[in-house]
Amino acid sequence: MQHFGLRVPLNQAGYYETGHHKELMKDVRGAINEGGLIAVCGVVGSGKTVLLRRLQEILDEERKITVSKSLSVEKRSIKLATLIAALFYDLSTEKQVRIPSGEKRERELRDLVRKNKKPVVLFVDEAHDLNRHTLVELKRLMELVEGGGGRLAVVLAGHPKLRNDLRRPTMEEIGYRTEVFSLDGIAGSQREYIRWLLGACAGDKKEAETILTVEAIDMLASMLRTPLQIQMHLNLALEASYQSGERPVSVEVVESVLSRQIDDLEPTLTRHGYSVKDLVEQFDSKAGEIKALFNNTLDATRTAALREKMLRAGLPI
């Protein structure tokens, strides 16, 4: 990267904010103040984790709301006990945190939140992997805290699958009580993001056109949608251009590194949080059928039936 005058890796450029980010941040903060379940949904690489990390930093600095975070990485196996433990660890003032069992656990947590004398927000990342029972229990936990004179908000961050799951008829108890926000990331601002990214990593007023041609920037901006996609393909283009001794990076180099399958059905659904296993379970199908659908080898009648079900469920077909 030094060949192009970049001093910082592209994935460490910092926080990029659009008007959409500002509005979303304002709306989520308002929802946190009111308490309850909040879902922030965006595709893989749209910047959910970065945005929520920034939100947590702001809340910590203001000291008006106590921030708690679940650090467990095994989301599919998470139960309510894991999330309650996170609250105990972040709210307790004891050096050696002891989490009681049975009903005493909930009673002590309710007292902890009340004694905290500030609203509490629990952040849960990768929440699309949480099962229905855990979500229902979270709702009941918030009601328990509220009944004890405290206020607890839970921010669930996940892929669009989370939003679609919350809208399913079987999730009515949770979905109707959840405020859902969609993170569109840098949609509509890809060119501005590329210019900002190169400037932030160069550490000076270097013009983006000294690194990439205008045509190369335009192609990246028109073909890619998320910060993660842009960072990855920009890295590939810079490496290819360095190897060929070309500077600035041309549109031909960018075209040579762009993934041809980036908008195929399988990667699109994966970015929205759907694995083959998820699709099999939700649409009463078989793994072989789903793979055949991805490969365009499934018979027309079954393809039409599956696509109709997926469209009704909110999948981007």
How should each PLM-predicted stretch be described?
Residues 1-35, 316-317:
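A short, basic N-terminal segment
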Residues 4-8, 70, 74-97:
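Conserved NTP-binding/hydrolysis module of P-loop NTPases
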Residues 34-54:
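Walker A/P-loop nucleotide-binding motif
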Residues 37, 107-156, 164, 168-169:
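Conserved Walker B catalytic segment
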Residues 56, 162-177:
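Short regulatory helix/loop adjacent to the ATP-binding pocket of P-loop NTPases
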Residues 72-74, 178-190:
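Conserved AAA+ ATPase "SRH/arginine-finger" region at the nucleotide-binding site
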Residues 93-101, 186-215:
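Conserved C-terminal "switch" segment of AAA+ ATPases
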Residues 199, 203, 207-317:
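C-terminal alpha-helical "lid" subdomain
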